[in-house]
UniProtKB/Swiss-Prot annotation:
Protein's organism: Escherichia coli (strain ATCC 8739 / DSM 1576 / NBRC 3972 / NCIMB 8545 / WDCM 00012 / Crooks)
Cofactor, how bound (note): Binds 1 zinc ion per subunit.
Top-level lineage group: Bacteria
Binding residues annotated for Zn(2+), in chain numbering: C188, C197, C200, C203
Alphabetically ordered keywords of this record: ATP-binding, Ligase, Metal-binding, Nucleotide-binding, Queuosine biosynthesis, Zinc
UniProt protein name: 7-cyano-7-deazaguanine synthase
Pathway membership: Purine metabolism; 7-cyano-7-deazaguanine biosynthesis
Enzyme type, top EC level: ligase
One GO molecular-function entry: ATP binding
Binding residues annotated for ATP, in chain numbering: F8, S9, G10, G11, Q12, D13, S14, T15, T16, C17, L18
GN (gene name): queC
EC number: 6.3.4.20
Family: Belongs to the QueC family.
GO annotation terms (biological process): queuosine biosynthetic process
Amino acid sequence: MKRAVVVFSGGQDSTTCLVQALQQYDEVHCVTFDYGQRHRAEIDVARELALKLGARAHKVLDVTLLNELAVSSLTRDSIPVPDYEPEADGIPNTFVPGRNILFLTLAAIYAYQVKAEAVITGVCETDFSGYPDCRDEFVKALNHAVSLGMAKDIRFETPLMWIDKAETWALADYYGKLDLVRNETLTCYNGIKGDGCSHCAACNLRANGLNHYLADKPTVMAAMKQKTGLR
């Protein structure tokens, strides 16, 4: 039996990954992390979606220690979430240092326990937002270290790594879940479900990608299929 663990936040990217994983694996587990995030509604959204989509199990892990160590606008009410700035350089204050290091490592430990061969994460380098822990080289390096440390080949899969946000919408549509991803996920840094606040970087990236996809579905769908190998 093929098993996978999806690092699941209930946002657009991880939900699209879950939708695909459910088609590719016999048994899919979801792991969501409570790290004291500013908008805890995402945990409830993740629970609802994991149940609705048919995950074998959904585990919420308490990693609130991260909140004590990692200062970010996503973990501190006193730090405002910035509006989207297209020309902004550097690492944004929405970056949570060490988050993906911790999440992927703990997801791999869980995968070991449930005998899953893969850990799936929705990180993406094409729409790079200044987060160093979303880079392909980081994921591969950590995957190598974790496999060595566990003496087990647990594969880190990044199905969205080389597709852009428009193509991510196309991937959701390919599996017949575009409306669900649009209306029932929570991607917004200000904690607003669906289309979100329209001001933060996450909402702008999501909206621009959707508009691009809806404006030229055949071209974007074809590009997504070419990059992912889907037919």
